[in-house]
Structures are given as structure tokens and as C-alpha cells.
UniProtKB/Swiss-Prot annotation:
GO function term, MF aspect, one: hydrolase activity, hydrolyzing O-glycosyl compounds
Lineage: Bacteria, Pseudomonadati, Chlamydiota, Chlamydiia, Chlamydiales
Top enzyme category: transferase
Keywords of this entry: Carbohydrate metabolism, Glycogen biosynthesis, Glycogen metabolism, Glycosyltransferase, Transferase
Family as reported in the entry's similarity comment: Belongs to the glycosyl hydrolase 13 family. GlgB subfamily.
Active-site residue numbers: D399 (nucleophile), E452 (proton donor)
A single GO cellular-component term on record: cytoplasm
Known pathway: Glycan biosynthesis; glycogen biosynthesis
Pfam family, one: CBM_48
Name this protein carries in UniProt: 1,4-alpha-glucan branching enzyme GlgB
Assembly and oligomerization: Monomer.
Length: 738
């Protein structure tokens, strides 16, 4: 009778590539009370040699690639190694214990495993004193999963994984492997189809279009402990974000700077320009350059386009050394259809949402995630925790939140299925986002979350305990749209669109807002910021300086996409660097200097950021001069403060040597910033010392200007402020109230 390991059914499954439990058949097996047997599977081999405690022995050859060697009882995995056909000597993968445990299984299938990035994928480790790589993957509908790579000739029968749970987790420890080893998954589906897949939990990948996963050794020595300890104290401070696409900020010798080259240059530039944070367009791995990173295939991997895993860690560490926070754009709303990645991962739509008639999102032709599956939510949650823990990022900006919240986003009637209450809200996505924010804020206080959300979905920045989603900030897309819509109007038409400026104040404090001028506004025919401005060159640059000043003064945190700070003329393209040579031209130099000084004023002025989410931080002065396009308001650090900033914006092209503003009683008024300064390329007007007028004098001035009739007694008289108002400019005054 053949020994059990030659059981025809077991061997047939192994040889045909459908064996889900190779660990039960291979490795060290007990044969009798006094003897064990080493059982090996080497498809295609004629002979196999084993080094057993220093002695080389030839294994017995059975049929179909099965070899065995009888050994004394109590042999351990460390006691023997096997010669491979390429001459290498390595320990037997099937002799080592499986480490995926019941707690791992419980947490993962519940969707709450907070260190899943240290369990799934390819994890270098040491088992029983033997170094190697442990491979674990979730593929519940596969008949067989193998790890293939340069270490086994990319042969799918050599290293099949063991199915460690009936819920589809597979595991194998491959001794002797080290960082740098390339691998993929080979799967046999329920229908018998063979699939080759990249690792969803892979920490690094070969350069596109080569989609191979790469084992990494995370051994970087961080030097930012002081930054991390102090990070929570910075959350209520100023936030002035510079949005950057790594591959097109600056080039050298015709190629983008890599992470390490970029680190010092960008950190120094941000310090010079008084930015507090950089926000990186996705640096998660992605196959298509033109997606800008927003079609992600490697949720746990920095893109290899700009350097290594460690290089990006160096970049973030360097930013922290210079006092600059790092925010990562992250895309949990959809993923690309590329067959090498997650789509149809184990032969079924494992990660995909399938309840709509078409699984593809109409906007991006991508798949949306199925948030009803705990394992999918754990995959996404693990991704963001990985970036915070292993890469030390300080904030996560969630892309396209609206597409997650609404089942009908981008779809017409009949193209979507309502939730169980008949509504259009994606209840599973809402629960995931609440879990996402809860876990991050509990586990990593001081790490901030941002929602790019373009609808009126309520309570985006309200705590989860109070029924909200729990984000720290929401991008104010309405403010951005209305502001740019106004600025694009030619000057004669602006009086008819004054509400574009005033309406956003009606909801400015309904959420904790961030005011963005992002990459999305300078592509696809929308023109650059300077290109949106009407008029001749002088007026365009004056308007851009005015716009930057307006953004700085408005309540909310700030974000500006790279190039806007010096008046980039062309639309942004990911395939070229910014037009830095424009800084040789005086107009662009002026905008650049103006932006620098506006940023400096912002970070030094608590009135502009300390309470910018509270109504008490903002008080209108005047927005009635629609014809001339003048608005003015006060900004306060707290409700009881006597010190305030008076912000005056003139959106027209006229010049007023004497312009009278109604104002609260003032003790003093000093000019801090004038975007019409000749140093910035302006006309140099607006520097006359402002005059504070008592109510009596202010009334006389208004009568003389024809603003009121002499016998008009409607309403109380107010104080006045007589200023010199330059064309198309922002003026910022420091005022002390009586």
C-alpha cells in the first residue's frame, strides 16, 4: 500500500494545481512512532538532494514530482535544507508553522484589524530562527493560490499557499527570501481559469507597466520624533497648504526629481514661501501617468516612478525636519479595471460593488468598492493606517467623497439600486467613513482628515458621536466655484454677480472648511489662474494678486496648487515641470513676492486662522458698493478681541484717492498689506495713511459724495474710514476697536 502522502486524490490535486492544503501533505510528516518523513514536491525534477544536519542525501523519487526522505523522529525545519534545480540551497517552506491566527481571522473578517498591513502581503520575518518572507493573501473563491517569482522560476506549482481558513485566507512562509524579491500571485479560479495578479497589499512595485510586486525591508531610521510628539499641538494653528504633483514640480536633465532630490528643494521652498503643509497628489502606485495617481492599484505602495520606499520616507522625514506637514491624497472611492490588479481578483468581483446594473462608475470607467464587505473595508482602513504608521503622513485627504456617499452619483434613473430604505445614500460607505475617522483620531491624535465633498451632504465635519462623518475639514467647493466664476467675469459684468462673493458667507461656518484653488481648476481647458483673469496683462496680474489676497483673508484653511503662486501661464500638465523660467519676468516675480508676503502675514496673524470656523471670527463692514465691486470685513481671533484685521477687496478697475468705509469706532488703523505695491508689479497706490472719521464728519463726507441726502435721518450715523483705494487690489489693515 502506498504511504498516505501518495494518496491518488491528494497527488492529483497537487499536480493539477488545485490543492488548497499543501501543508497537510508536504513538509515533515509523522510516519510512525520512531520515524518522520520529509515530503517534497518538485514538479519537473528528476532528482532531489537534501542536506540533513550537514550530510547530503538523495530523496526517494515517487511519481508526479513527489519526493521523500525518511528521517529520525523529532527533526526540525532548521535541521535540513533542499537543493533547488538552480543549485541554491534553502529550507523547506512546508516545514514551518502557519502564523495566521484566530484573532487575525476574527478581526479581519470583522473589518477591524488595525495592523493588517503587518499580516497581509509579503512580510519579511524570522520563524524558528530562519529568515524569510511570509506571504498571506485573501482569495476566498480560488481553488489554489501560489506565490510565483524569480525565486521559483515563476512556476505556479512550486509554492502553493495553504488555505488557513474557510473564509479564504492563504499563507506560506518561503525561507531564504529577502527584500528585493519580485513576486505575484497565481490563482486557479472556481472555473479553472488561471489568473496572474499583483498583490493588493504589496508595499512596492516594479515600474509601470511592469506590475510585479516587490518585497521591501522597512528599516528606515526616522529622525522626526519631536515633530510627531508636537503634531497634535499644531492642529489648531495656521494651515497654508501647497498642493504638489511630485512628477511635475521641478525637473532635472529632462526627468522629474526623485523623492530624495525633491525633499530638500521643496522643504526649503515651502519654508521660504511660508507654507505649513504640502499636499501630495496620490503617490500610491498607479499604472497610468495621466490619472495623476487617482486610479490606484497599490494602496500600500509608494509609486516607484520617483524612487524607492525608503526614498519617500526620507522625503517625509525631511519635510518634518523643516517644520512642514505632509498630507496625502487617498482614493478609497474607486479603483481601475486593470486585469493585473484587484478587478475580479480571485475570479469573482471580490472588491467590486455589484448591485448596480453596470459595475463601472460612469465618470471614470472604474470599479467602486463594496463597503458592505468587512474585508474590503479592512483593506482600505489598513491602507490609511499603513501610511500614517509606516510613512508618518500627517493628514489624509479623501478624494471624491460625494461619489462614495451617493449610490446615484453620476448615474441616471434605472442605473442604480436604492438602499434598503429606498434612498440614494450609500449607508455602507457612510459607516466606513465614520469608522475611518474614528480609528484615525483615536489611534493617531493630531493626524487630520479632509473630505473633497461637493454636495450639501450634512455634518461632514461633525463628530461621529454627534451623527456626523467625523472629518476635520471639508473642501469648500462652493466657495471655490463661486469665487472663480466671479473673477472670470469681465469688469462691466461683475456688478451683476456680486452674490458670488457674498453668498458663501451664508454657509461659511456650517462646516470646518478649507478654501482650495486646486489642480482640478487649472486643467482640461479651464485655464490657469492667471489665464482666467480678464483684461490686459497688467490687470490680469493685479487680479491674481487680488485673488490670492482674497483667499488669505477669507475664513477657512488655505490650499493653493503649485504654479499659482507665481502666475503659471499654461495649464498644468503632469508631463512637464512648472514654467520656472517665468520668474525671470517682473510680473511673475511680483506675484511670487506678493504670495510670499501674504502667506507670511497669514501665519503670523491669529485673526486669520485661530477661530476661522466660528461666526465670531468674521464681521461684515460693507458689501453694498456693487457698482465699484468693493467688499470689506473684519477678522477676529476671538469674539472679545479689540484687535482685528480689516480686509478690503476692490474687484473693479477704478482708482479712488478717497474712499469712505462705514466702520465701527476705531482707536487705530495701520496698513499691513497692499497687493498694489510696486514691489509686486502694482501701481503703488493705496499707501496714504487712513483717516478715522467721527460719525459727524463721516456723515458730512457721505453727504458731499452724494451717498445720502442732507435731510436723510434713516438709521444711526456710524464712524468712517477714509482710505486710498487702488484698482484691483486687496488691502489689509490692523485695527484696534474702541
Amino acid at each position: 500500500m502506498d504511504p498516505f502522502f501518495l494518496n491518488t486524490q491528494h497527488v492529483e490535486l497537487l499536480v493539477s494545481g488545485k490543492q488548497s492544503s499543501p501543508q497537510d501533505l508536504l513538509g515533515i510528516v509523522s510516519e510512525s512512532l520512531n520515524q518522520d518523513r520529509i515530503v517534497l514536491f518538485r514538479p519537473g525534477a528528476e532528482t532531489v538532494f537534501v542536506e540533513l544536519r550537514g550530510k547530503i542525501q538523495q530523496a526517494e523519487s515517487h511519481h508526479s514530482g513527489i519526493f521523500s526522505l525518511p528521517v529520525m523522529k523529532g527533526i526540525s525545519p532548521q535541521d535540513y535544507r533542499v537543493y533547488h534545480q538552480n543549485g541554491l540551497l534553502a529550507h523547506d517552506p512546508y516545514a514551518f508553522p502557519l502564523l495566521w491566527g484566530e484573532i487575525d481571522s476574527f478581526l479581519f473578517h470583522e473589518g477591524t484589524h488595525q495592523r493588517i498591513y503587518e499580516r497581509m502581503g509579503a512580510i519579511p520575518c524570522e520563524i524558528d530562527g530562519v529568515p524569510g518572507v511570509r506571504f498571506i493573501v485573501w482569495a476566498p473563491h480560488a481553488q489554489r493560490v501560489s506565490v510565483i517569482g524569480d525565486f521559483n522560476g515563476w512556476h505556479g506549482l512550486v509554492n502553493p499557499l495553504h488555505k488557513v481558513s474557510d473564509q479564504g485566507v492563504w499563507e506560506l512562509f518561503v525561507p531564504g527570501l529577502t527584500a528585493g524579491a519580485c513576486y505575484k500571485w497565481e490563482m486557479v479560479t472556481e472555473s479553472g481559469q488561471v489568473l496572474i495578479k499583483s498583490d493588493p497589499y504589496g508595499k512596492f512595485f516594479g515600474p509601470p507597466p511592469w506590475s510585479v510586486s516587490v518585497v521591501i525591508d522597512d528599516s528606515y531610521e526616522w529622525t522626526d520624533s519631536e515633530w510627531l510628539e508636537e503634531r497634535i499641538k499644531k492642529t489648531e494653528g495656521p494651515m497654508n497648504i501647497y498642493e504638489v504633483h511630485v512628477g511635475s514640480w521641478r525637473w532635472q536633465e529632462g526627468q522629474p526629481l526623485n523623492y530624495k532630490e525633491l525633499a530638500d528643494q521643496l522643504a526649503l521652498y515651502c519654508k521660504q514661501m511660508h507654507y505649513t503643509h504640502v499636499e501630495l497628489l496620490p503617490v500610491t502606485e498607479h499604472p497610468l501617468n495621466e490619472s495623476w495617481g487617482y486610479q490606484t492599484t497599490g494602496y500600500y505602495a509608494p509609486t516607484s516612478r520617483y524612487g524607492s520606499f525608503e526614498d519617500l520616507q526620507y522625503f517625509i522625514d525631511t519635510m518634518h525636519q523643516h517644520g512642514i506637514g505632509v498630507i496625502l491624497d487617498w482614493v478609497p472611492g474607486h479603483f481601475p479595471i486593470d486585469s493585473f490588479a484587484m478587478s475580479g481578483f480571485d475570479g469573482t468581483p471580490l472588491y467590486e460593488y455589484t448591485r448596480n446594473p453596470s459595475p463601472l462608475h460612469p465618470h471614470w470607467h472604474t470599479y467602486t468598492f463594496d463597503y458592505a464587505k468587512p474585508e474590503v473595508c479592512n483593506f482600505l482602513l489598513g491602507s490609511v493606517l499603513f501610511w500614517i504608521d509606516k510613512m508618518h503622513v500627517d493628514g489624509i485627504r479623501v478624494d471624491a467623497v460625494s461619489s462614495m456617499l451617493y449610490l446615484d452619483y453620476g448615474r441616471y434613473a434605472g442605473e442604480w439600486v436604492p438602499n434598503r430604505y429606498g434612498g440614494r445614500e450609500n449607508l455602507d460607505a457612510i459607516r466606513f467613513l465614520q469608522q475611518f475617522n474614528t480609528v484615525i483620531h483615536e489611534k493617531y491624535p493630531g493626524v487630520l482628515t479632509f473630505a473633497e465633498e461637493s454636495t450639501t451632504f450634512p455634518k461632514i465635519t461633525v463628530s461621529v458621536e454627534e451623527g456626523g462623518l467625523g472629518f476635520d475639514y471639508k473642501w469648500n467647493m462652493g466657495w471655490m466655484h463661486d469665487t472663480l466664476h466671479y473673477f472670470e467675469k469681465d469688469f462691466p459684468y461683475r456688478p451683476y454677480h456680486q452674490s458670488d462673493l457674498t453668498f458663501p458667507q451664508w454657509y461659511a461656518f456650517s462646516e470646518r472648511f478649507l478654501l482650495p484653488f486646486s489642480h482640478d481648476e487649472v486643467v482640461h481647458g479651464k485655464r490657469s489662474l492667471i489665464g482666467k483673469m480678464p483684461g490686459d496683462a497688467w490687470r490680469q496680474f493685479a487680479q491674481l494678486r487680488l485673488l490670492l489676497g482674497y483667499q488669505i483673508c477669507q475664513p477657512g484653511k488655505k490650499l493653493l496648487f503649485m504654479g499659482g503662486e507665481f502666475g503659471q501661464g499654461r495649464e498644468w500638465s503632469p508631463g512637464r515641470e512648472l514654467d520656472w523660467e517665468l520668474l525671470d519676468i517682473s510680473y511673475h516675480q511680483g506675484v511670487h513676492l506678493c504670495s510670499q508676503e501674504l502667506n507670511a502675514l497669514y501665519v503670523q496673524s491669529p485673526q486669520l486662522w485661530q477661530a476661522d470656523h466660528l461666526p465670531s471670527s468674521f464681521r461684515w463692514v460693507d458689501f453694498s458698493d456693487v457698482r465699484n465691486g468693493v467688499v470689506a470685513y473684519l477678522r477676529f481671533a476671538d469674539a472679545d478681541a479689540k484687535k482685528a484685521l480689516l480686509c478690503v477687496h476692490h474687484f473693479g478697475v477704478g482708482y479712488f484717492p478717497h474712499y469712505l468705509l462705514p466702520i465701527l469706532p476705531l482707536e487705530s488703523c495701520d496698513l499691513l498689506m497692499n497687493t498694489d505695491d510696486t514691489r509686486f508689479g502694482g501701481s503703488g497706490k493705496g499707501f496714504r495713511e487712513p483717516e478715522i472719521l467721527t460719525p459727524e464728519i463721516a456723515r458730512q463726507e457721505r453727504e458731499a459724495a452724494g451717498l445720502i441726502e442732507a435731510d436723510d435721518e434713516s438709521g444711526p450715523d456710524c464712524w468712517g474710514l477714509d482710505i486710498e483705494l487702488p484698482p484691483s487690489a486687496t488691502l489689509i489693515f490692523s485695527v484696534t476697536l474702541q
